[in-house]
């Protein structure tokens, strides 16, 4: 099971982009598979993903049980706190000072002014 936590991203185990060692960690899978037997009944259970598009790890939380063609499924979603600014979520201090709902990824995109958000600026600040 520990093998599922091993990560390789261009042969490195951490990133050089973010402000803290925690922010530079590579945690989780690419999102196409996860460890079996996830405890979906705990609110604190987090499913960690690493996204090469945003150059960081993030997590999803269990949302609900459902089914597709009578096959049981579970839905997970990225919670709002993942993209809150560091004033509202101090855990995000590593990822800069952009407004809530967006992530400035220019540090890992050769300085190009690129900001990432959830679809349709979900959870973004009003301004």
Positions of PLM-derived features:
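Extracellular or lumenal secretory-pathway regions
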Residues: 1-72, 78-127
């Amino acid at each position: 099971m520990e093998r599922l936590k091993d990560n390789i991203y261009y042969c490195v185990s951490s990133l050089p982009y973010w402000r803290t060692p925690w922010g530079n960690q590579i945690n989780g899978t690419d999102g196409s598979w996860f460890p079996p037997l996830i405890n979906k009944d705990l609110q604190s259970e987090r499913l960690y993903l690493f996204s090469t598009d945003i150059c960081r790890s993030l997590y999803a939380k269990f949302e609900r049980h459902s089914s597709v063609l009578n096959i049981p499924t579970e839905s997970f979603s990225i919670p709002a706190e993942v993209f809150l600014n560091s004033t509202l979520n101090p855990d995000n201090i590593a990822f800069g000072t952009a407004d809530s709902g967006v992530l400035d990824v220019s540090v890992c995109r050769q300085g190009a002014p690129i900001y990432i958000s959830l679809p349709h600026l979900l959870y973004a600040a009003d301004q």
